[in-house]
């Protein structure tokens, strides 16, 4: 079974018209715990491939609202055991790298995704995001990739930008551009999902 793990109902609306018989759709809610839980539920239900798509924020000044990207690796940038064991931000005890590798189809430019449990205009995260090579940020993708890796299930992620750092308050951009980003995501989705 191919399963889609999607954070928000507005994003799930993009997916529904393209579901094939036998596909699963799991609307998780926002955040890493919700996404991880829904991903495990999908795998327990028989998913042998997990797909995630949705809107996200960009951190490369060359990026534009409604640009679409495949994700080739993801990191949980708010997971930090450095004071406990000296590991790099994002590295879990059982791993040697902060990155979870993802499959891509080569249809859109590939980027590194950083996932954390906050939506913020704060500048505080910028140094760690830059150090990790993150150019796109969301609140779910790395958690989905993490659960997939733990279960040996392939995962693909597609993101469309609703906001870009340095081009105004990200919260204001998100609110103003969500519909445009969802439209762009819907145009990119059919080829990417393989329908």
Predicted region positions:
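Glycine-rich phosphate- or other oxyanion-binding loops that anchor nucleotides, phosphorylated ligands
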Residues: 2, 6, 11-195
